[in-house]
Amino acid sequence: AYGLGNGKGKTIEERSRIEQAMKLTGISELAERFPHQLSGGQQQRVALARALAPNPELILLDEPFSALDEHLRQQIRQEMLQALRQSGASAIFVTHDRDEALRYADKIAIIQQGKILQIDTPCSLYWSPNHLETAKFIGESIVLPAHRIDKNLVQCQLGCVPIQSTHSDATSGQILLRPEQFSLVNISQNSTACTVSTFEAIVQNIEFRGRTTSVQIAINHHEIWIEMGYMPDLKIGERIDVYLQGRGMFYN
């Protein structure tokens, strides 16, 4: 454990810390192996154990899974997250994978050109970002020029769209919507708590992708892709009703 020094004369307390770190990361059976005898995933576990051995309050992880294949990355990611939580250490996790950040972080800092744009929980960053750049970076988005016609209503290429409350009094700006806000199912029939707007659309394309189906639609000549968890009974060129659930985000 490099954090405790390379010397052979380790104290009982230091050896106890090493054993605990190895147990946390599931590498106790690898104690006598050399580095070249370890797989990529095992090497990552060893690296985390070395970092945890001194009982640090804070650990920096700089894209630790970038060299692993996707299947192994998911497995090691879960194991490391569990070990970190059990150790009680906080971690700064540097990643360019937004899905990874949204899935595992307690809080996310969005940094652009060395400047922190926003620090917040994943949910708040995704649905209530302070900046348009943050909103576009953190998830798939549809951005359209918009003109405010009421406090919580704008006119855009799609039509009239309700927006979230905003501190801005600007009459012109841009509205941002998430593709998953669009649906072929009117949820307002089962719930009165959600704002739902209806638009007429034309089916442009249908792509079956196994677990999901992507449907490309055109609303007032603006094309949008919708991800669905089933294979819809649709035909290209068909006119359908599309429902926008919730409100858009307005930026000036």
Residue ranges and their predicted role:
Residues 2, 39-40, 138, 145, ...:
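Short glycine-rich loop/turn motifs that provide flexible caps or phosphate-binding loops at active sites
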Residues 141, 152-252:
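Non-catalytic connector elements of ABC transporters
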Residues 1-133:
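ABC ATPase nucleotide-binding domains
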Residues 71, 137, 188-189:
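Residue-level signal for well-ordered alpha-helical positions
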Residues 121-151:
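ABC transporter nucleotide-binding domain
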